[in-house]
Swiss-Prot record:
Pfam family, one: Trans_reg_C
A single BP term in Gene Ontology: regulation of DNA-templated transcription
Record-annotated DNA-binding residue ranges: 129-227
Modification after translation (UniProt): Phosphorylated and dephosphorylated by MprB.
Species of the source: Mycobacterium sp. (strain KMS)
Protein name: Response regulator MprA
Positions of the Response regulatory domain: 4-118
GO molecular function annotation: phosphorelay response regulator activity; transcription cis-regulatory region binding
C-alpha cells in the first residue's frame, strides 16, 4: 500500500504541483486548503505524513502543529513557509514540526526531506535492541522510553533520533555534518540552525531537574555526550 501524504496549502498551484510530484514518486496524496480542513481529514483518515504550509486562512499551519502535538499525536509534519528567518524556523520547530522547508524550494529537496522524515518514522531496530545507557541517562530503542535517573523524559521523534545517535557514541565528538546527515537524512545547508535548536531542546529536557549537563558543544566541530565539557 502506498504511503499516504496530506498536502495542506491555500495556494492551489502549490497543492497541485506537490500532488503531481508526490504521486509521480509513488505516494498517495490528499489535499486540504487550510488548517481546519486538514484537522478534519487527519481525524477521519489519518495520513502517514503531512506537508503543511504556515500562512493559511482560518487556521494556520503552526496552530495545526500545536493542536496535534497537544493531543500526543506524533504524525510526521514537514512545514513549508515563505519566511526563512531564524525566528520563523524556531517557531515552526517549537510548534512541533519535524522539519522545515522555506519557499521557494526544489521538489527534489522536498522529496529527499520526506524520505528522511518517513525513515525516522519507521525505525529499523530489531526486537532485541538493547537499551543504551550513559551515566544516569537511559534510552530504549524498542519502547522509545527515555529516563534520567527515575525521571521519565518525553521526546519528539527527531529529539529521540538525535539523542540516540549521541548516546550510541558516548565521549565521541560527532561532527555537525555527520549528525545532520544521519538524523535528518541528507546534508542541510550550513546556514540552517535546526540542529542547534534541537540540541537546545534536549539540554532543557535532560537537565529539567537540575541535573549536570551531558550534551556539550565542541566549538567549530559538533557535539559530544560526556561527563564534563571538552
Amino acid at each position: 500500500m502506498p504511503v499516504r501524504i496530506l498536502v495542506v496549502d491555500d495556494d492551489r498551484a502549490v497543492r497541485e504541483s506537490l500532488r503531481r510530484s508526490l504521486s509521480f514518486n509513488g505516494y498517495s496524496v490528499e489535499l486540504a486548503q487550510d488548517g481546519v480542513e486538514a484537522l478534519d481529514l487527519i481525524a477521519n483518515n489519518r495520513p502517514d505524513a503531512v506537508v503543511l504550509d504556515v500562512m493559511m486562512p482560518r487556521l494556520d499551519g503552526l496552530e495545526v502543529c500545536r493542536q496535534l502535538r497537544s493531543t500526543g499525536d506524533d504524525l510526521p509534519i514537514l512545514v513549508l513557509t515563505a519566511r526563512d528567518s531564524v525566528s520563523e524556523r524556531v517557531a515552526g520547530l517549537d510548534a512541533g514540526a519535524d522539519d522545515y522547508l522555506p519557499k521557494p524550494f526544489a521538489l527534489e529537496e522536498l522529496l529527499a526531506r520526506m524520505r528522511a522524515l518517513l525513515r525516522r518514522t519507521s525505525p529499523d531496530e530489531g526486537p532485541d535492541s538493547p537499551a543504551l545507557t550513559f551515566l544516569d541517562l537511559t534510552l530504549d530503542p524498542v519502547t522509545r522510553e527515555v529516563t534520567r535517573g527515575s525521571r521519565q523524559i518525553s521526546l519528539t521523534r527527531t529529539e529521540f533520533a538525535l539523542l540516540e545517535m549521541l548516546i550510541a557514541n558516548p565521549r565521541r565528538v560527532l561532527t555537525r555534518s555527520r549528525i545532520l546527515e544521519e538524523v535528518w537524512g541528507f546534508d542541510f545547508p550550513t546556514s540552517g540552525n535546526a540542529l542547534e535548536v534541537y540540541i537546545g531542546y534536549l539540554r532543557r529536557k535532560t537537565e529539567a531537574s537540575g541535573e549536570p549537563r551531558l550534551i556539550h558543544t565542541v566549538r567549530g566541530v559538533g557535539y559530544v555526550l560526556r561527563e564534563t565539557p571538552p
